[in-house]
Amino acid sequence: MSKTHQKVVLIGDGAVGSSYAFAMVQQGLAQEFAIIDLNKKRTEGDALDLEDATPFTAPKLVYGADYDTCKDADLVVITAGAPQKPGETRLDLVDKNLKIIKSVVEPVVKSGFQGIFLVAANPVDILTYAVQKFSGFPRNKVVGSGTSLDSARLRVGLSKLFNVSPVDVNANMMAEHGDTEFAAFSSATIGGLPLYDLAEAKGISKDDLYKLEDDVRNKAYAIINSKGATFYGVATALMRISRAILRDENAVLPVGAPMSGEYGLKDIYIGTPAVINANGIAEVLEVPLDEREAKAMADSAKTLEEIAKNGMAKIQG
């Protein structure tokens, strides 16, 4: 990965993709930003619109492109996929989005791309797994957005409950980016203090925390029911992961990471903190879990494994 000229390709110029493109331009990340979508007229329009923002941020070449452009990219970000509609769960999207992902990954690999994949299309844990299988890439070079957005939602909720800044909250949602996710409260801290100790001192009960966990789990549905889709939060989460990759930060972020025995799991992508740098996932950090959390992780993994197995069997067979 070049330090002087970095290239990012976005595949999927819908609400999430275009919001991500805007976030990347605002942050001045990468010198070249290409956008691929079936709707080429939209990508051309977005590229022209984003180009007008570059004098206020940093010089950047922004343009609509095709898959051949991926050849020398450092990072390919996939947001393409059918959106989650009101009343749908993320797992309801499996079959149709697996087909879309397969149609995307094959031409990217054919182009000669050798960089990092970052996946955000839902259900993201299963689609990240599928990208790795379809591409044949080393597992560290395929990263899912995982529970990055969910963890941000948890930190915002805890910041309100404890009346502190969310930047001083260190807490993660883990497992599926979806209905079986859970809050790892036992390892959470606020200002370096264990969350449970601080909660007890402030008279905040575990029931209060579990209610917050449920609110976080359902926040996406509230947003979708109000405005039709979520995109600003996840786009910013994608920008943060991209920054860690492009700047080789060794940042610890909650992402969709491949399991190699962590939490007793193998051959699955699931939400957990990991070290992110120019190589993608440099290290998976196995967070100590209490009994409640360990059961939730195992149950979530079982759900993902079953759906991934069935979905991949359909598309491959």
Swiss-Prot record:
Question: Is the keyword Methyltransferase assigned to this protein?
Answer: no
- One GO term (biological process): glycolytic process
Q: Give this protein's Gene Ontology molecular function annotations.
A: L-lactate dehydrogenase activity
Name the InterPro entries on file: L-lactate/malate_DH, L-lactate_DH, Lactate/malate_DH_C, Lactate/malate_DH_N, Lactate_DH/Glyco_Ohase_4_C, NAD(P)-bd_dom_sf
Binding-site positions, NAD(+):
16, 37, 42, 67, 81-82, 103, 120-122, 145
Q: Which UniProt keywords apply?
A: Cytoplasm, NAD, Oxidoreductase, Phosphoprotein
Compartment(s):
Cytoplasm
The family database entries (CDD domains) matched by this protein are listed as: HicDH_like (cd05291)
**Which chemical reaction does it catalyze?**
(S)-lactate + NAD(+) = pyruvate + NADH + H(+)
> What family does this belong to?
Belongs to the LDH/MDH superfamily. LDH family.
Its biological purpose is as follows: Catalyzes the conversion of lactate to pyruvate.
How does the annotation summarize its subunit structure? Homotetramer.
Protein name (Swiss-Prot/TrEMBL): L-lactate dehydrogenase
